[in-house]
Amino acid sequence: MKIKMFFLTTAFITQSTYASELPVIPLRDLVNAALTHQPSVAVSYYETEKKNSDLDLSRAALYPTLDLTSGLNNNRKESSGTERNVENKVSLSYRITDFGVRGANIRKSEYERDNSKTDYEKTKNIVSQEVVTTYYNISKYREMIDGVNLEKEFYKKMLETFSLLVSSGVAMQSDMRKVQVSIDALNTRSIMYQSMLDDEMYKMQNMTGLNLSPDQIQSDEKFNLFKKYIFVESPEKLMDMVMKYNDDYKMLVNTRKAATEDINAAKSSYFPTVDLVSSYVQNNPSGSAKKSDYEDEFKTGINVSFNIFNGFRNSA
């Protein structure tokens, strides 16, 4: 008796430990796991970071550039020998105007950045939607399997009853066969639903990267899709909602605006550019070089550049 109680206690503890290792995972945690695990979300995020860098690069054109260069020059002359000079040059350049090229490039980068953000949110929504759909499919197939099992238990009890009735001569053998056919049909349905459940479980594990059991997924019975869905009857209101919330539409608009700014930048490049340039040169002559021939100098000027021909690049 003591040995029997020991085995029962051990089995109960083992079962409790196993149950504690398989907690029910909320839908929110499954969605977060999928957003972390799916490569498409990561790729979309890094594309957003790239577009942010492109925007910073476009904005950097608004700032002046400061350069420091050093060079060693050798000049051999027959009369005086070899002249050497170490030249240190600091130059400051600032583009005063380019007639809208930089502004158009910045606006283009902003539209592309907004596009990447919208695509990132769209990717997360797609992944979340797939997780939610799979989540409720798993719950649905579990309930269908449970219903089939309950019905099978009912027919099995009926089969036992008919066995007694046939033995006593009250019922016929054909009645028992009908019950057995019903049980076989339920077994077939159970196998089919189990296969569907396995497919959905594999899909959930592939999306989340988690090793899950069907018992860990239980839907909220209070969830009602049609109570939360907003039915829109007005075509104008529906179109307004599409223009405001639809990711594909917003991306299409931003792509068109970015292309327009690209065209504006190409048209503006037909105009000249005006730059303010300042430089300071420090010379350090040596050898047979004279200091008077290599004096330090400071220059300030305005450069106007106009492109005459670049192989039809702007028109292309």
Summary of predicted features, one role per range:
Residues 43, 48-50, 55-57, 106-108, ...:
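Heptad-repeat amphipathic alpha-helical coiled-coil interaction surface used
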